[in-house]
Regions:
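Acidic/His- and Gly-rich active-site-bordering loop/insert found
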Residues: 2-94, 99, 103-106, 110-121
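Histidine/acidic-residue-rich, glycine-tolerant segments that coordinate divalent metal ions
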Residues: 83-93, 119-198
């Protein structure tokens, strides 16, 4: 059985690896390859999606219902200025926590392997690229594959510095902001810039 200390060590190792090797958008091939191989090493049979930019692993335990856990994978086009030992090795950065999300999901997959007799659901693990863009984003593309049509409940998560590391915040429905594009037309009379509505 994995001890909590071993799982913590595994989690930290994974997070630091992902932090050092960020990729953006749908160009997450090395990240997906790493996740694919790690899941194979943990005893899963993962498959690639979206031209090998995404990874899904299904654990079919013959249960009536299926739950899914999802992690985003992509980084941002930001140059990291930190001087930490596991600093990004390229011109991108995991500045939004996706490195932690992938590490958490791999650690969950590892822990579940140790507790199969206690699991009451089939489980699907989803590693999704392009959460930060480009549109239409990775989630829509994964949905269009129909590989996740059998899921009864879906769990996603996001790290935050508003909670301590030993806490989990739960909210039904939307919990984080998301960007969107829209057009706005304002019609009015010309006038002084301080009061364009008059």
């Amino acid at each position: 059985m994995e001890t909590q200390k071993n799982l913590n060590t595994y989690l930290i190792h994974q997070r630091r690896y992902f932090h050092m090797h960020p990729e953006i958008g749908f160009d997450t091939y090395q990240t997906a390859s790493y996740i694919y191989n790690e899941l194979k090493n943990l005893g899963y049979s993962p498959c690639y999606l979206l031209n090998k930019a995404a990874v899904v692993a299904k654990l079919n335990l013959g249960k009536e219902k299926t739950i899914a856990f999802r992690s985003d994978m992509d980084a941002l086009p930001i140059q990291e200025l930190n001087t930490i030992a596991y600093k990004s090795t390229n011109s991108y950065m995991h500045a939004c926590g996706h490195d932690a999300h992938m590490a958490i999901l791999l650690t969950l997959a590892k822990a579940i392997r140790e507790h199969l007799n206690e699991i009451n659901y089939n489980i699907t693990f989803i590693f999704q690229p392009a959460e930060e863009g480009p549109l239409p984003g990775g989630s829509k593309k994964i949905i269009e594959t129909h590989l996740i049509d059998d899921i009864d409940a879906f769990f996603a998560y996001h790290v935050t510095n508003k909670l301590t590391s030993d806490s989990i915040g739960i909210k039904v429905g939307a919990a984080c902001a998301a960007p969107d594009l829209f057009d706005l037309t304002i019609t009015g009379k010309g006038c002084h810039a301080s009061t364009p509505h008059l």
